[in-house]
Each structure stands twice: as C-alpha cells, then as structure tokens.
C-alpha cells in the first residue's frame, strides 16, 4: 500500500512536469529529490506511530483502577508484536548452512557432527587413563558460507584453583591453539588446513573461554553432572543448593529487568521524539529548487536524532542477553539409595518472564514493551551407582 502510494505521488509529479513542459536536465537531482520525499514519508509514518502509542498510553493512564480500559489497536504501520528490543536482534543456532546441492548439505552436516566429536575428544585428552585437564567444552557452533567455515565453541576451566593442574591446562591450551592455528603460525599440518581438504573451503576454529560457569547452559549442565552424585544420597536439595550458592550470582532479577527495559524504552522514546522534531523542522524549511541547500539541511538534522544521548554507550545499552535473570535445574532419576525409587527435584531462582507490566501500571491486556525471553535449555543424562538420572538446565538472559 505504501509503495503504491509512493508510485502515485511520483506519477503525479511526472504528469505535472509534462503538462508544464518542464525539462529536467539533471537526472541526479530528480532522483535525490524522490529519495528525500521517501524519507519524509517514513518520518511521517514514525510520527503517526508514536502519536498512536502515546494516545493509547495516555488513555490507559487516565483509566482508574477497576475500570474497563479502551483498547486502541495499532495498524500494520505500528509496532508489530509490541516488541521493545527491535534494534538488536540475535538468533540462536548451532549450525547455519545453505547449499544448492542437497547431498552436499547432508555431507556437511555429517562432517559437522564428526568435527564436534573430534574437538570434544581433543579437549578431554587422557594420558595413562587420567585426565590431564579439567576443561568442559560446549557444543560447536558452525557457520557456513560459500568459501568459509567458522567453528566456534565455548570452554571452561573447571580446575582453575589448583596451581599444578592449572599449569597443565595452560600448557595443554597453548598446544591446542598451535594445533588449531589460533596463533597464526601458518603451519601446514594444523587442524584448520586439514579440515579445509574435507570441506573444500577455508576453515577457522574459534575457541572462547568463559570466566563463569553459568554463561552457557551446555557447560553448566555438564559441570553439575561431573560432580560426585553419590555423596548427595541423604538429600540433593540442601547439598546442591549450597554448591550452587558458591558459583551462581546473587540474582536481583526484578531490578535488573526493570532497569534494562526502562533504559531501552528511554532510548527509543528519545530517538522517536528527535525524529518527530526532525520532521517538523523539515516541514518548516522553505521548499526551493536548490537541491544542495535542502540536502545539507536534511543531513544536518539527521545527525540530531541522537540528541541528549551518549552515542558511545548506546551499543552496550541495547546489547541483548548480557544479564542472567533466572535459572532452574531439574533432577530426575535415581538420585538416592532409597529403595531405588525414582525422584524429581526442581531448583528455581529468578524469573523467566521479561514483561514490563510486572512492575509498571500498564494493564495486562496490553503487554507492551517486553523483551522476548531467551530460554537456554540443555539436557544431560548420566549414571551413578543407584541408576540413571537426568539433569535439565534452563537459563534466562536479558
């Protein structure tokens, strides 16, 4: 609809020019004028969207408690799904791949699984039936392109407090970095070059060290599973709660979510208010045929969109999934020697809901200004002397 409206306006401009026998000698100026017209239309739509949202919020604030609010529906030009965080979208995936050949796509997927097992074996190397390292590795994240493959994984040093083992781990990781060509030593027999022959494209390996165990659910669940489950026969809840209190942050999820969402909301309001002021200022500028003056005024006003904001802090303020606001652990299986009976234990801390109306006066029917919950899930099964058990870890970042 918007494109049809734009085409109608442009066609009317062309008809007017033909009727008046106006010959445009500079086609570049004509094209840029059309672009300026399109930009003004976009600013006008943003202006209408902000006015609709402000009108809706004002009507909601004027309704007393217990009264039926008047719902104003926002059309397609409005904020679709009312998501607050639209500036920085992040996709969660383990493999990003596309091939025009279906057989090649299947082969690359099989190779990815084999490389995942290979890297896991290398990171958990054993000498003389003993682990020389206490490194926990996550699943690999494979990003394919036409001429390159980037393999990324996270790892955590589980024995960082032991100096002797820590020295072994440092030596082991230095050896791994050389093998994976992380240090750019240009070895012909490094793992990246070897894998390039199989994938027929350039391969890079990107290991990322985590400083905290709870930053990845895969590593977190493996860390819990590696602990001695036999010593918790008398009660897993108390013992594990004590262990988790030492490694997990003290969550103040209410204040973290409120400050983060309100901060992004203020950024959006300031940005749209500046855009509205920009539109009003452009409308007050006298229209003339001098394109250079009009273009200079427009560019000068575009730079004012981020007025009253510290632009250096905006990328960090809108960064998603940097705060842990909720975690839960579910143990299910034979965890104790109580007649071999299967039991289930749930540990929950924080919140898994990022809605703003939880602490604001906005009615629940609106559910505006929310961050989609990022639930990072992982299941891990293991066996102890009592039988098999399963650990399910769920993390929520904002």
Swiss-Prot record:
It is found in: Mitochondrion. Pfam families: VAR1 (PF05316). Its main location: mitochondrion. One of its GO terms (cellular component) is mitochondrial inner membrane. Component of the mitochondrial small ribosomal subunit (mt-SSU). Mature yeast 74S mitochondrial ribosomes consist of a small (37S) and a large (54S) subunit. The 37S small subunit contains a 15S ribosomal RNA (15S mt-rRNA) and 34 different proteins. The 54S large subunit contains a 21S rRNA (21S mt-rRNA) and 46 different proteins. uS3m, uS4m and uS5m form the narrow entry site of the mRNA channel. Belongs to the universal ribosomal protein uS3 family. This is Small ribosomal subunit protein uS3m. It comes from Saccharomyces cerevisiae (strain ATCC 204508 / S288c) (Baker's yeast). The gene is VAR1.
